[in-house]
């Protein structure tokens, strides 16, 4: 009986400590932070492979998995009509490209035609900051090298 009581007391104590030791899991962005494209520019006609250069100010770029205040890494959103859920980790597929090593540029191939691009900056576990940091959406036109 005493062992059972002691075990229950320990468990309750741990739960109480954990409850009071909760840390706000939301990663905050700075007031002056801004995410933007350095290249290409909105409306630009490009050829494959397409070089895309990311810009950010007011935040620190770090690889995924490193939890530091006011930091994160870029995600490139391709041809998305709306932003993904900003309270969940950003999906990883061909329309949601992760740059979790802290990259600030990429070279990709896109099909010919018009495409939209948007940047979304997120924390160490791919969840957008509060408030979220996303670029303006830009349109580019990909042409064949023979055009």
PLM segments and residue spans:
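A beta-strand/beta-hairpin structural motif
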Residues: 87-106
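Internal, hydrophobic beta-strand segments that form the core of beta-sheet-rich folds
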Residues: 111-126, 134-140
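Short, compositionally biased P/S/T/A/G/V-rich stretches that sit at domain boundaries
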Residues: 26-47, 147
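Contiguous beta-strand segments within globular domains
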Residues: 44-59
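Short amphipathic, basic-aromatic surface patches that mediate peripheral association
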Residues: 55-66, 127
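Bacterial N-terminal signal peptides
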Residues: 8-17
């Amino acid at each position: 009986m005493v062992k059972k009581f002691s075990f229950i007391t320990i468990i309750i104590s741990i739960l109480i400590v954990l409850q009071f030791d909760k840390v706000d899991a939301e990663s905050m962005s700075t007031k002056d932070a801004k995410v933007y494209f350095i290249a290409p520019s909105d409306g630009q006609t490009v050829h494959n492979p397409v070089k895309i250069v990311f810009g950010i100010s007011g935040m620190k770029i770090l690889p995924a998995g490193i939890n530091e205040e006011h930091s994160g890494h870029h995600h490139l959103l391709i041809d998305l009509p709306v932003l993904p859920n900003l309270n969940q980790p950003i999906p990883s597929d061909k329309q949601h490209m992760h740059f979790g090593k802290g990259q600030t540029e990429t070279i990709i191939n896109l099909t010919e035609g018009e495409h939209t691009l948007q940047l979304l900056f997120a924390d160490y576990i791919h969840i957008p900051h509060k408030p979220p940091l996303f670029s303006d959406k830009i349109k580019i036109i990909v042409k064949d090298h023979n055009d």
